[in-house]
Amino acid sequence: DALERLELPVNLAKGVARIELLGNREVYMDRHCGVLAYTTENIDVNGGTVVVRFYGRELRLLVMTGQELRITGVIERIELVE
């Protein structure tokens, strides 16, 4: 496979969203495809192949660009919905 020959991580090469959780207070996500729903208790993000649902308290979309977003608050649960 061409991706293996280039030695690139498959998820990076195929544009899959990447999620980084910093404790239970902050989430960094890149390669997203937009926010679908936003309240202080629930944020749904289009991850390309899945919808990523963040549940918690006092959730806040701190930063959002075309490629990256950062969510703060008390993150209680993350769900991937196909």
Question: Where in the sequence are the language-model features?
Answer:
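N-terminal intrinsically disordered, cationic/polar leader segments
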Residues: 1-82
